[in-house]
Amino acid sequence: MSDINATRLPIIWAPVVPCISDDNDSTLTRGQR
């Protein structure tokens, strides 16, 4: 099970991390959206 979680975590966090970093640059996220 740990192997499955290890493979899923990067897939889940891959799109999440950029969104969090984009929130720090609110001007960029607003420009994109």
Swiss-Prot record:
Coiled coil: none annotated. InterPro entries: Amanitin/phalloidin. It comes from the Eukaryota. Expressed in basidiocarps. Residues 1-10, 19-33 form a propeptide. The keyword Cell division does not apply. GO terms for molecular function: toxin activity. There is a cross-link at I11-P18 (Cyclopeptide (Ile-Pro)). Processed by the macrocyclase-peptidase enzyme POPB to yield a toxic cyclic octapeptide. POPB first removes 10 residues from the N-terminus. Conformational trapping of the remaining peptide forces the enzyme to release this intermediate rather than proceed to macrocyclization. The enzyme rebinds the remaining peptide in a different conformation and catalyzes macrocyclization of the N-terminal 8 residues. Keywords: Toxin. Probable toxin that belongs to the MSDIN-like toxin family responsible for a large number of food poisoning cases and deaths. Belongs to the MSDIN fungal toxin family. This is MSDIN-like toxin proprotein 2. It comes from Amanita exitialis.
